[in-house]
Amino acid sequence: MKRIVAALDFSNATPGVLEMAASLAKAHGAELHLLHVLEPEPTYTAYGFTPDEFPAIHTFQEEARKRAKQKLDEVAAEVPDGVSAASAELAEGSPLQALVDFIKEKEADMVVLGSHGHGVVASLLIGSVAEGMVRKALVPTLVVPAPGKG
């Protein structure tokens, strides 16, 4: 095993995902690649609106991007000594598709992700990402439960 991807949603599952991925990376001498996926800007074209009609959406998305990058940098700083944290990247788009693309790009041998996100909507979304990864089975997939789950 040479490359492990840790998919991070910044929920209460994130510390466990990072700990498990880092432990596996250290045990196998593998590179650790961190990924967080930011949802794309909402579009309301079905209602006849264009994104340019709502500059606040762009401002909100840019602020979300900055905060996500800051949080990703904070999490990357928590990677233990002895683990090669090769990259910490922020992607935008569909979480499942972005994760699949990242795994292919990095030629990862394994992915570690949390079973549920934060909040009702996020937990459904992240749950569906975990389920999608297991179904696609591009690489071995380790799903780490959030504290209090299971």
State each model region's role.
Residues F54-Q70:
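A short acidic, glycine-rich active-site loop
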Residues E74-V111, G148-G150:
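Structural beta-alpha unit
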Residues F10, M110-G132, G150:
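Glycine-rich, Arg-bearing micro-motifs that act as flexible, cationic patches
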Residues L35, S87-A91, L142:
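General small-molecule cofactor/ligand-binding pocket signal
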